[in-house]
Amino acid sequence: MAAATTTGTHRGLELRAAQRAVGSCEPQRAEFCRSARNADEFDQMSRMFGDVYPDVPVPKSVWRWIDSAQHRLARAGAVGALSVVDLLICDTAAARGLVVLHDDADYELAERHLPDIRVRRVVSADD
């Protein structure tokens, strides 16, 4: 559900997106677009998501899931490790049986501590 930054990986995601195998949810798009340096770049990013990645709706029960997830993370000593956006993305993926594509170690922590979270790093941790 996250976009990649390296050319080879980005091309692979474009091919999978063309097959409708990669989607994007509103929280992920909002987080990605906040890296825009100006209005034109913001518009380009927004168009890219609309053109390439199908929408994956956030579940209506997301806040109950987040409350439960934060409780599990607190028991593991990691309550502050995931942002609200990270948790929204995790629930959206978990509710639909999807894998979170990421470039962020926080999602690996989520996979260790939260049920139904599956993740895949899209770039090497060494890059």
UniProtKB/Swiss-Prot annotation:
Q: Does the keyword RNA-binding apply?
A: no
Domain PINc residues, every copy? 26-120
EC number(s) in its UniProt entry?
3.1.-.-
Q: Is the keyword Ligase assigned to this protein?
A: no
Cofactor dependence: Mg(2+)
Source organism superkingdom: Bacteria
Task: Enumerate the residues binding Mg(2+).
Answer: D86
What keywords sit in the KW lines?
Hydrolase, Magnesium, Metal-binding, Nuclease, Toxin-antitoxin system
One molecular function GO term is:
magnesium ion binding
Q: Which cysteines are joined by disulfide bonds?
A: none
Q: What family does the Swiss-Prot or TrEMBL record give for this protein?
A: Belongs to the PINc/VapC protein family.
Give the function comment from the record. Answer: Toxic component of a type II toxin-antitoxin (TA) system. An RNase. The cognate antitoxin is VapB6.
Q: What is this protein called?
A: Ribonuclease VapC6
Q: What is the lineage of its organism?
A: Bacteria, Bacillati, Actinomycetota, Actinomycetes, Mycobacteriales
